[in-house]
Each structure stands twice: as structure tokens, then as C-alpha cells.
């Protein structure tokens, strides 16, 4: 395919090329498709996990190399990764996500080849994240992260807020900001007013603040027949705690387990709202997917999508039970006409700033500049 990246060989490096990677996996899969659509050649590198081979088709025929892990999975030491990167004869390498061994492998590749190397932390330098597992992150900084940050051509931020976090952590002020792309919008125009169903889709993890959400749900003023449907995956202990709190209610909230593909589409199709009360996010794909489907959202400011509030596509909730309860009450008070206006605003955002076309154009400029700057021996301005 001929395009602005015609012939450019781009490596995408990440901890997980499967559903276990959550939103980062979805972002990498979308990024790979975008590069292919612009004429580039993509090679994906990741640590092997139980879903690696099942989910490889998400990369639509691009080569996916997964390396077996030696030792603790949370570190992800894969002794064959550096050699695999070097053997791929890449023009540039792009790391998605940090704090695991792929960061060390990427830094080694950059040092040995001198070729352009990009890092997208995906919100993993948010203070809420860096405050957790402090000693492990301190070892990672000393062992390889700082080396990688200094050797990168540039660091990529999803939002201006993340750009500040990157600067605070790395002492580099040259990061560039490009948001994740959402899916193309699913239809436009007037939608049928959905039944009172609120949906969460994503990882079951403390940072998602789901315990507070369910407790707020139990205390909210809800319309007749209202349901909270939580779909996701995570640590068994986190899931068990969530199910315990759900069981304290009246049966209107339920945990569905993981939802992918057609199951996820069916969930979105019946949702009046998508909710995300997170303590910390990079730029959540779940929200972009909701907006592309014309579904307004209830979310925290920590989702880093202030455009949603200003455009009227989202209701802001706080992170404590009382604030979430108030936001749920406000959402349920919206009538069909007000809800439709918010649905229209969501579609507009998905069609404009977060559209695949807009995001692709921004990345085409970055990658094209990469090749030019490589010839000149310069970093991105």
C-alpha cells in the first residue's frame, strides 16, 4: 500500500500483545492498523502470555513475535527479546508502556542501532501509579528506565497532563502530544433512548475505583429497571472483593466477566451510559469506544478527557462514594432529548479530534520527520 509511511519498518514493543494488556493492547492494535493503512510495515514484539496466540489475529497479518518470560511475570525478563529486535532490521522502534523488561530491551536496541526510538508511557507516569510499588519502580529507574528515557528520540504523551507528568519524571521537556484514536463513529442521527443501563468495560483493578462505584450505585436514586453491568477481567482477589460488594445490593448490579468482540458490542448497544470512575488513566479507550457508539459517559477528571465535559458528552464524577452517587443521580435525571444532545456531542468528538483520520495525520508527520531527522542526525524539534 502506498501512503505517507510507504516502506517504513516500524517495530511496536509492548508487555502484552493480548487482551491481558487491557487498554494498552487495544491502543497498540489500533496503532498497528494505522501504520499499515499509511503504507508502513509493522512488526509487533511482546512478552508471551496465555492469550498471545489467540489474539495475534488482531494484528491482521503483521508479524507478532512473543518471547517466553524467565522468572517473575511482573518483571517480564525475556532473554531473547533484544536479539529479536535487532534481527528485525527496523527503521524505528516504538515502546508502548513502561516499568517492565521491554523497556530495557528497547533501550538496548536504541543504544546498539542508533535508530529512532519512541516511548509512549500510556499514563504510567501518573503520580497515582508511581506512588504504588515504589521500590520496584525505583529499581526499574536505576536498572533501565532512565537509560531508555534519555536515549529516546522523543516521548509521546496522550494528553497535556501526561506531558507534564513525563517532564516531572524524566526531566525532558520535548514530549509531543497525540491522543489515542477511537473507532470510527457507528452511525449518526437520532438514536432510540436506551433502557436505564449503565456499563463498565475494562480491567478489574483498584485504580478503576469499582468498589466505590458499586457502593454509590447501591445508594443512588435509580429509575425503575436500572441496571449496572460490569464486564472485565483482573486479579481473582480483586474480582472476589467486587462480587462481595455487588452482593450487598438489591440485584440490580452484576459482574459479567470478560467481554470482547461481539459480546462487548452487545453491551455497548444496550448502554445508556458508560461509566469510568478511575483514580488514574492515560487516555481510556473505553471512553473513546463509547463516544464512537454515541454513548455519553460518566467519568472522573482523571480520565484526562476534559473535552468530554466541555462538549457535553460526559458527566464528571468524583472519586469518593458521595460524589459518584451525585453524578449517577444527575445522569439518570437526563430525559430523552437531553440524552440525545449528549449522544450527538459524543459522536462529534469521535468524528473530529479522536478520529482515526486526525490521529493518523499527526502520526504520519512524526514518523516522516523521524526518517528525515535520522538522516540529519537530529532529534525531533
Predicted ranges, named:
Residues 5, 13-21, 27-76, 233:
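N-terminal strand-loop element at the rim of the active site
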Residues 44-51, 201, 227-241, 257-259:
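Glycosyltransferase donor-sugar binding loop
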Residues 112, 137-154:
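Membrane-proximal helix-turn-helix segments that form the acceptor-binding/catalytic region
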Residues 156, 182, 190-220, 229:
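Conserved donor-binding/catalytic core segment of Leloir-type glycosyltransferases
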Residues 161, 181:
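Carbohydrate-associated surface elements
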Residues 279:
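Aromatic "clamp/platform" in nucleotide-sugar-dependent glycosyltransferases that forms part
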Residues 296-300:
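Short hydrophobic beta-strand element within catalytic cores of glycosyltransferases
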Residues 313-322, 331-336:
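Conserved acidic donor-binding segment of nucleotide-sugar-dependent glycosyltransferases
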Amino acid at each position: 500500500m502506498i501512503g505517507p509511511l510507504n516502506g517504513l519498518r516500524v517495530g511496536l514493543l509492548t508487555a502484552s500483545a493480548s487482551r491481558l494488556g487491557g487498554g494498552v493492547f487495544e491502543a497498540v492494535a489500533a496503532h498497528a492498523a494505522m501504520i499499515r493503512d499509511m503504507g508502513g510495515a509493522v512488526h509487533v514484539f511482546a512478552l508471551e502470555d496465555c492469550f498471545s496466540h489467540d489474539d495475534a489475529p488482531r494484528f491482521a497479518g503483521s508479524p507478532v513475535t512473543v518471547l517466553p518470560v524467565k522468572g517473575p511475570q511482573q518483571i517480564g525478563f525475556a532473554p531473547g527479546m533484544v536479539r529479536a529486535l535487532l534481527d528485525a532490521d527496523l527503521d524505528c522502534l516504538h515502546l508502548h508502556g513502561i516499568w517492565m523488561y521491554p523497556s530495557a530491551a528497547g533501550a538496548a536496541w536504541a543504544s546498539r542501532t542508533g535508530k529512532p526510538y519512541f516511548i509512549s508511557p500510556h499514563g504510567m507516569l501518573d503520580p497515582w501509579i508511581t506512588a504504588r510499588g515504589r521500590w520496584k519502580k525505583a529499581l526499574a529507574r536505576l536498572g533501565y528506565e532512565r537509560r531508555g528515557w534519555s536515549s529516546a528520540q522523543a516521548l509521546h504523551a496522550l494528553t497535556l497532563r501526561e506531558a507534564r507528568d513525563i517532564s516531572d519524571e524524566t526531566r525532558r521537556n520535548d514530549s509531543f502530544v497525540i491522543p489515542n484514536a477511537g473507532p470510527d463513529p457507528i452511525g449518526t442521527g437520532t438514536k432510540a433512548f436506551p433502557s436505564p443501563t449503565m456499563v463498565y468495560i475494562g480491567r478489574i483493578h483498584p485504580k478503576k475505583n469499582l468498589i466505590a462505584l458499586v457502593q454509590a450505585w447501591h445508594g443512588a436514586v435509580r429509575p425503575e429497571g436500572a441496571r449496572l453491568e460490569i464486564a472485565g477481567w483482573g486479579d481473582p482477589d480483586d474480582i472476589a472483593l467486587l462480587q462481595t460488594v455487588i452482593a450487598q445490593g438489591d440485584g440490580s448490579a452484576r459482574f459479567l466477566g470478560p467481554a470482547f468482540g461481539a459480546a462487548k458490542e452487545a453491551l455497548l448497544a444496550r448502554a445508556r451510559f458508560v461509566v469510568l470512575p478511575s483514580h488514574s488513566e492515560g487516555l481510556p479507550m473505553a471512553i473513546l469506544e463509547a463516544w464512537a457508539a454515541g454513548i455519553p459517559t460518566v467519568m472522573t477528571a482523571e480520565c484526562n478527557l476534559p473535552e468530554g465535559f466541555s462538549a457535553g458528552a460526559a458527566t464528571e464524577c468524583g472519586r469518593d462514594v458521595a460524589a459518584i452517587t451525585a453524578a449517577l443521580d444527575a445522569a439518570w435525571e437526563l430525559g430523552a432529548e437531553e440524552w440525545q444532545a449528549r449522544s450527538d456531542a459524543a459522536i462529534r468528538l469521535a468524528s473530529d479530534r479522536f478520529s482515526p483520520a486526525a490521529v493518523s495525520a499527526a502520526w504520519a508527520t512524526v514518523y516522516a520527520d523521524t526518517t528525515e531527522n535520522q538522516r540529519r542526525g537530529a532529534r525531533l524539534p
